[in-house]
Structure formats: C-alpha cells, structure tokens
Amino acid sequence: MSLASIPSSSPVASPYFRCRTYIFSFSSSPLCLYFPRGDSTSLRPRVRALRTESDGAKIGNSESYGSELLRRPRIASEESSEEEEEEEEENSEGDEFVDWEDKILEVTVPLVGFVRMILHSGKYANRDRLSPEHERTIIEMLLPYHPECEKKIGCGIDYIMVGHHPDFESSRCMFIVRKDGEVVDFSYWKCIKGLIKKKYPLYADSFILRHFRKRRQNR
C-alpha cells in the first residue's frame, strides 16, 4: 500500500489511502468507500461511493446507529423455524400441568364419604338391606374394583346389607347376600384401592402409600 502524492498547486485535499482495488478517503465530510469497477489495473478506474454517514459521526460510534442496525442479521432457515415450533408446542404442553393426586382425590373422596354415611350415619341398622339407589351405586361404582369381585359375587347378588364384621365386632361393613342365601362380607377399602390401580396405574402405588394408613385386613 502506498500513499498517493498530493499536488501543491491543487487545493488542500483530504488524504486518502489506496489499497489494491479499494480507495479509502478520510475527510470532515461523510466517509465514502470507493469500489473500483472493471479492471483494477486501469489508469482511470470508475468508482462507486457508498455513503456510510450523513452527519459526520465517527466510525464505530454506537450512538449514531440504532441498536437494531448493529445486530448481526439472522436468516431463519426452514429447519430452525420447525425447531422453534416444536419448542413452542412442548412449552404449551408443559403449561397444561395436571395434578394427578388431586384428580384421584376428586374421584375417591366422595365414594369414601358415601360408604361412611351408609355404615356410620345411623341410617341403616344391622342386617338392614340398602335402598335400591344406594345398592346400585355400590354394585356399579365400588364392587367391580374388588380384587376378588367374582369370588365374592359367586352365584349372583340377591341384595346388599349392613352388619358387624364377623371377626371385628366393633367394626361395621357391608355384606353380599347371594341368591343361594350365603352371606359374604367385602372390604370397601379394597374396592377403593382397586379403583385407583385400575384408573390411575402410574400414580396408584405412591398415592396409596401416602394416603392409606395400614389397616386391618378384611376378607
């Protein structure tokens, strides 16, 4: 790179440097970058000027540029846009959080309250048969989840009644009176646990360990 000579007879000109095919001119006026066109060896190269500032601000002064202009341009490819869409979908799925413990409680708590009402409210005395509505609820919503449901039902259900447990006189439970007259007790707690395991298999064990204290084993 060589410094071009400046004739003494000409007016004071702004110094400039010439480096191969590019000419850089420095003056009080806005900076211009000259890009020769055509053959770089031509004696009279044609140039184009690219104006970079209109107010004479210094090069590299970030205050003279907007923050957006200083950012490196980003070209969004089709793959990156697809990845962003997948991330947004994952985030939206994460927002839809489900508290499974509350979900299980919403189902089981009303059933437990219903059975306790039958056993302990005084509505039914020992050996009383359940009302058709209460009996239907027990048969449809609890009994099918007992681990030995078919064995308990046997030849078929005649009706369901309330009475004292044969092994624990202070405890009341429900009994199935079969069509052949045989009476069989069943644990509603086993029905509740079976319901949880059937409907919520992924969360059943942890839920049962947390909410069910160890109980005396009923038949």
Swiss-Prot record:
Location (main, coarse): plastid
Cited InterPro entries: DCL-like
Pfam families in the record: DUF3223
Composition-biased stretches (Acidic residues): 79-96
GO biological process: chloroplast organization; chloroplast rRNA processing
Gene3D superfamilies assigned: 3.10.450.40
Name of the protein in its database record: Protein DCL homolog, chloroplastic
Native species: Arabidopsis thaliana
